[in-house]
A protein has these predicted regions:
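Phosphate/nucleotide-binding beta-alpha loop and adjacent structural elements of enzyme active sites
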Residues: 2-159
Length: 159
């Protein structure tokens, strides 16, 4: 997620256009104030299908939310946006990376972006999805390979 916009603002210095998504209303309000004009932002989360979900929020950590059933948080797919380009896809969505990637199949197939995902075991804890499933899925379905692992992030590139 976009959180409060720190990463999006940094990426905006390197890319002509940056898209960021943040479902938490408080984080989103901060994000809007923190990003430059070349950052397109939406108050929504990314997933494998359009839905409205509930979210557990941790008051002592504004980046540690997770989805937990129905609610009023909007989830969209990256494919549903029909982006004109995608060179780099970075997902730090607290274990929802496998689902967000499933909603980006067409985008990944069309643009073959460099993909960075956080992989710290939250997909298993919150959703019953193996820690490395997103990585394995990208390798199996799209022929990606791991280029580098940095702390809890995995950077994958097309073969």
């Amino acid at each position: 997620g976009g959180n409060v916009g720190v990463w999006a603002a940094k990426m905006a210095k390197r890319f002509k256009t940056v898209w960021t998504f943040e479902p938490d209303p408080d984080n989103y309000a901060c994000l809007v104030k923190n990003v430059p004009d070349n950052v397109q932002h939406m108050r929504a989360g990314l997933g494998d299908r359009v839905a409205n979900v509930g979210m557990t929020l941790f008051p002592d950590n504004c980046g540690a939310h997770y989805i937990d059933g129905p609610g009023d948080i909007e989830i969209i797919t990256l494919d549903g946006l029909s982006l004109p380009a995608c060179d780099y896809l970075c997902l730090d969505v607290e274990g929802y990376e496998p689902k967000a990637l499933c909603g980006a199949k067409e985008t990944i197939a069309r643009y073959r972006p460099v993909i960075q995902i956080e992989e710290k075991g939250l997909s298993e804890r919150y959703y019953g999805i193996r820690k490395d499933e997103a990585e394995r899925w990208l390798e199996r379905e799209f022929g990606y390979r791991v280029a580098k692992k940095v702390r809890k992030d995995v950077i994958l590139v097309p073969r």
